[in-house]
Amino acid sequence: MGIQGLAKLLGDIAPSGIKENEIKNYFGRKIAIDASMSIYQFLIAVRSDGSQLTNEAGETTSHLMGLFYRTIRMVENGIKPVYVFDGKPPQLKSGELAKRTERREEAQKALSKAEEAGDTENIDKFSRRLVRVTKEHNEECKQLLKLMGIPYVEAPCEAEAQCAALVKSGKVYATGTEDMDALTFGTTVMLRHLTFSEAKKMPIKEFHLQNVLSEAGLSQDEFIDLCILLGCDYCDSIKGIGPKRSVDLIRQHRSIDKILENIDTSKHPPPENWLYKEARELFKNPEVRNPEEIELKWEEPNEEALVTFMCQEKGFSEDRIRSGIKKLTKARHGSTQGRLDSFFKVLPSPANKRKLQDGKGSQNKKAKTGGKFKRPK
């Protein structure tokens, strides 16, 4: 779920912290991608008849096709992706997971009714709600990434938290996910829609945490409390207090603790045994692997092993897979020059940066940043 309504709220209270960008402008960037979120997107991208892509054995292969081609597209645009997989969910998430199970059961009942009625629109709608990423999906995707030469990280807990840790340590430039709680975990740059299909024509939404906090007039601790008030995966929120009221309360009282001392709890009762302090601590100090102990290596794809896995085992067309591998190999060799601005330690002013870009020819055209924000790591 992430944080309820946060993207829209930030568009209202901190628009300078958000910009739209094109994938080509991330040339030379290392980006940590929330693997489960991406795999989920690939799985719900069902075909026009409402079914997922399967092989002759009836095994779902949508996730493998999506991962293969979207990863190639990123590498063709000079991006160095690293996928981060979820580990064991925190105990605080058990309530949210139970709610998701209930919603799936309701969706299953609704799907059965839609199938009886021949209601194709609702069949599609409720089929999507039943999709979930399994351990098998994850393991197959890890195998594919390894054969493609793309690094991945297994987080001990939440993938978004591990992505944020990689960004904060300077190992990567940004977190790629649809879940807004990557910002709550402290990622300095977050990209939405990065792994969407080109057919959707959705620009990449780029969030810069420091600009968001500055324009919203909040510290990171206050922002975390705001996210808990809006609704997160780890505890309930106060009923009857919407996004605008939540912002006003945080700006006035600066913490949930002070809000509880000052609001009329008879009108807005907090949840019983409210675990907001535990949720706050989880956002501030999540369980992650030490980024300094993580080595990220992008290597040559193993063509024959890829063909064996994707074609002989999973039933994909050999011509198409070999064509994809050629694109991947060519793109890898074309993106080794890196970003021009990665050679500079001092951050130039926006005006100086434009002068540098105007004077460096085609190499710099590839390396342009398209924005006024901080240089990459």
Curated annotation (Swiss-Prot):
Q: What EC class does the entry list?
A: hydrolase
Listed binding positions for Mg(2+) 2 are D179, D181, D233
Q: Where in the cell is it found?
A: Nucleus, Nucleolus; Nucleus, Nucleoplasm; Mitochondrion
List cellular component terms (GO): mitochondrion; nucleolus; nucleoplasm; nucleus
Q: Where does DNA bind?
A: R47, R70, E158, G231, D233
Which BP terms in the Gene Ontology apply to this protein? base-excision repair; DNA replication, removal of RNA primer
Q: Which domain of life is it from?
A: Eukaryota
Give the start-end ranges of region Disordered: 337-377
> Which terms does the record give in the GO molecular function aspect?
5'-3' exonuclease activity; 5'-flap endonuclease activity; DNA binding; magnesium ion binding; manganese ion binding; RNA-DNA hybrid ribonuclease activity
Q: Where is this region: Interaction with PCNA?
A: 336-344
Region entry I-domain, spans: 122-253
Q: Where is this region: N-domain?
A: 1-104
Main subcellular location: nucleus
Names of the cofactor(s): Mg(2+)
Per the UniProt record, which EC number(s) apply here? 3.1.-.-
Give the co-factor note: Binds 2 magnesium ions per subunit. They probably participate in the reaction catalyzed by the enzyme. May bind an additional third magnesium ion after substrate binding.
Biased composition range(s): Basic residues: 363-377
Q: Where does Mg(2+) 1 bind?
A: D34, D86, E158, E160
Subunit text: Interacts with PCNA. Three molecules of FEN1 bind to one PCNA trimer with each molecule binding to one PCNA monomer. PCNA stimulates the nuclease activity without altering cleavage specificity.
Per the record, the similarity remark reads: Belongs to the XPG/RAD2 endonuclease family. FEN1 subfamily.
- Name of the protein in question: Flap endonuclease 1
**Organism, per UniProt?**
Nematostella vectensis
